[in-house]
């Protein structure tokens, strides 16, 4: 049996661990990983800024892929799924046949469509490479802004504080973690965050990002106020990475996500989807816990 796995994040690797515990005759497993390193712990990604190395964050024991028929291809994402031929085309142009295909592409950061969002010094907070780029830029920066006041945004704000930057959080809603807490909880949370030395700006709609006068950037808000900063990190939520599924004609939800049944099968019985890219019973779980 040929199994191809697209994606090697936390849930993709958890699947491989489970698969490795079973004896399957004549099994070949090919894992296509977009990133330059095997799966690592994204949950504790912020610890990278307090000294945890990339190797220490790895979830893959040495020798894990030293199994007959198992292959990990780094920096080689899938670019096409040919369902009729049951083939996956990789970025290197290789065509891989499969008996079963597992899509574990996870999610991608949502970046608000703000003019100037692609300026140098603007980042997303998702991969170790993102963090390395932030760290390099932060060596000459004095201040940083996190766009997004959810849980991940607050974690990112801690990372900027750990880098020694004057840190701001800009949130569109009227309170931090607006989905998780009510107004009273939001007031308590805001006070706690400000007590940690982080400046909080709620109810702010960013219209554009332009050159600053005393800093690299100026963020212009809809209420005519503005904020200058040397670096900006977008942490405004995630979206399921389902582009391949859409291109191949698999069923996806109205707001994204590959539709799966209780066995994680997609609308094609030979293709499965797991993790943050999957939509089960109308729900997308934007966290790894259900996969564990």
Task: Indicate residue ranges for each PLM-predicted region.
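N-terminal Rossmann-like NAD(P) cofactor-binding module of classical short-chain dehydrogenase/reductase
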Residues: 102-103, 233
């Amino acid at each position: 049996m040929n199994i191809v796995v697209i994606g090697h994040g936390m849930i993709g690797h958890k699947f491989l661990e489970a698969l490795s515990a079973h004896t399957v005759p004549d099994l070949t497993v090919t894992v296509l990983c977009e990133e330059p390193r095997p799966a690592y712990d994204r949950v504790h990604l912020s610890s990278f800024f307090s000294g945890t190395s990339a190797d220490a964050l790895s979830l893959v024991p040495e020798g894990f892929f030293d199994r007959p028929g198992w292959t990990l291809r780094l920096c080689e994402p899938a670019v096409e799924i040919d369902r009729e031929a049951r083939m996956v085309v990789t970025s290197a142009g290789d065509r891989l046949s499969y008996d079963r295909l597992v899509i574990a592409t996870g999610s991608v950061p949502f970046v608000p469509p703000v003019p100037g969002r692609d300026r140098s010094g603007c980042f997303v907070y998702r991969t170790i490479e993102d963090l390395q780029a932030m760290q390099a830029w932060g060596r000459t920066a004095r201040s940083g802004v996190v766009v997004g006041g959810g849980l991940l945004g607050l974690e990112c704000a801690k990372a900027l504080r750990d880098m020694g930057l004057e840190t701001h959080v800009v949130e569109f809603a009227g309170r931090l973690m607006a989905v998780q807490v009510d107004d009273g909880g939001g007031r308590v949370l805001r006070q706690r965050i400000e007590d940690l030395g982080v400046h909080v700006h709620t109810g702010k709609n960013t219209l554009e990002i332009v050159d600053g006068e005393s800093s690299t950037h100026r963020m212009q808000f809809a209420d005519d106020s503005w904020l200058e900063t040397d670096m900006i990190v977008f942490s405004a939520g995630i979206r399921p990475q389902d582009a391949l599924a859409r291109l191949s004609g698999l069923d996806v939800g109205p707001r994204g996500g590959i539709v799966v049944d209780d066995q994680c099968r997609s609308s094609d019985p030979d293709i499965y989807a797991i993790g943050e890219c999957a939509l089960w019973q109308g729900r997308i779980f934007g966290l790894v816990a259900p996969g564990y």
